[in-house]
């Protein structure tokens, strides 16, 4: 499996594109990035306001047979993403609104939507 980055000018949602790539059997692991989203969404189907100039991306990969429970990813993912952001913003303190929002100086900088998808009897996590 080779990790691939898929770049788009505009998509409905980066998660939607990742789901399509998985279900169409085109890719099992990768990252979808876009400059804009026309129908971004948050948890519980809430509308996500997608302002041009922000970063929109989804990472997807297959889960092994003995993967942790889905809700454990909700705890791990914000910490991993926070650590990645800190590589670029070393002097900023990131705070959390569990389970899926990250803030710097009280301003929301990131919302995390994770979805579990099954295709051809395999489970995939999209973040």
What are the language-model segments listed below?
Residues 1-90, 110, 117:
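N-terminal lobe of the biotin/lipoate ligase/transferase fold
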Residues 13, 102, 120:
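Surface-exposed, flexible loop/turn segments at secondary-structure boundaries
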Residues 50, 104-105:
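Active-site beta-strand termini and strand-to-loop segments that position acidic
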Residues 96-98, 103-104, 113:
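Glycine- and Gly-Pro-enriched alpha-helical subdomains that act as flexible
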Residues 107, 118-123:
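Catalytic/RNA-binding core of pseudouridine synthases
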Residues 125-127:
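Short, intrinsically disordered, charge-balanced linker/junction segments flanking boundaries
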């Amino acid at each position: 499996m080779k990790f691939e980055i898929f770049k788009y000018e505009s998509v409905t949602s980066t998660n939607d594109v990742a789901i399509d790539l998985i279900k169409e059997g085109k890719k099992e692991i990768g990252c979808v990035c876009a400059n804009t989203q026309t129908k971004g969404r948050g948890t519980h189907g809430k509308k996500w306001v997608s302002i041009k100039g922000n970063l929109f991306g989804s990472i997807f990969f297959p889960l092994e047979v003995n993967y942790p429970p889905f809700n454990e990813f909700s705890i791990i993912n914000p910490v991993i993403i926070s650590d990645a952001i800190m590589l670029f913003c070393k002097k900023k303190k990131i705070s959390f609104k569990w389970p899926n929002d990250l803030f710097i100086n009280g301003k929301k900088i990131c919302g995390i939507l994770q979805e579990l998808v099954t295709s051809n009897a395999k489970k995939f996590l999209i973040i």
